């Protein structure tokens, strides 16, 4: 949706198991390009987000929120015909299941809805978990249909916008943040599928 949006979240993604667990590093090169990675190579990278480890207070809060919200996520996913594992993966990356998450760009809630997106999909209160998940899931369904159920393009559009994906010929835009976002959410998606947490 908005470049660098996820950096404003206190808890962001990569919280569950080793397959998706990593710290986040940032680098700005001489041309001003921004790069994100969980495996820094070479100089210039700075640690900007450390992943809470199992057993920590942050991890326990994450798990508590996830368990509490899972029935609601399943309900909305079924209603709008979207894989619940995909919805969980997006929520994991967008807000780490923190319904109070707010970005510097103005995105709010579990699925980090911007005002126009919320209005477009009938959300009147972005802070309400049920409304936020409903609106975000409806948006995912719209994007899935728009991009012929290509998961990666759907995620790229969720992050950078539909027009950005269209601008680059229905390919993932060459934005470091968007490319990192897509890879991260796909990892979460694979985790939720394999771990059956979405069933």
Residue ranges: model-predicted function:
Residues 1-6:
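Positively charged n-region of N-terminal signal peptides that target proteins for export
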Residues 7-17:
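Bacterial N-terminal signal peptides
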Residues 18-22:
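Sec/Tat signal peptide C-region and signal peptidase I cleavage site
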Residues 25-29:
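A short beta-strand micro-motif
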Residues 40-199:
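Catalytic glycan-binding domains that act on GlcNAc-containing polysaccharides
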């Amino acid at each position: 949706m908005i470049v660098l949006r996820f950096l404003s979240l206190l808890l962001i993604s990569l919280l569950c198991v080793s397959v998706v667990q990593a710290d986040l590093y940032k680098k700005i090169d001489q041309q001003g390009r921004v790069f994100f990675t969980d495996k820094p190579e070479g100089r210039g990278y700075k640690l900007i987000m450390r992943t809470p480890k199992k057993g920590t207070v942050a991890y326990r809060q994450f798990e508590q929120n996830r368990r509490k919200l899972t029935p609601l996520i399943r309900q909305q996913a079924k209603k709008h015909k979207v894989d619940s594992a995909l919805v969980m993966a997006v929520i994991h990356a967008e807000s780490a299941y923190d319904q109070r998450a707010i970005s510097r760009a103005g995105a709010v809630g579990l699925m980090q809805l911007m005002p126009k997106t919320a209005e477009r999909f009938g959300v009147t209160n972005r802070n309400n978990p049920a409304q936020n998940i409903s609106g975000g899931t409806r948006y995912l369904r719209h994007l899935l249909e728009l991009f012929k159920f290509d998961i990666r393009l759907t995620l790229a559009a969720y992050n950078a916008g539909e027009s950005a994906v269209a601008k680059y010929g229905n390919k993932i835009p060459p934005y470091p943040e968007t490319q990192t976002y897509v890879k991260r959410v796909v990892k979460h998606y694979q985790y939720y599928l394999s771990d059956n947490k979405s069933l």
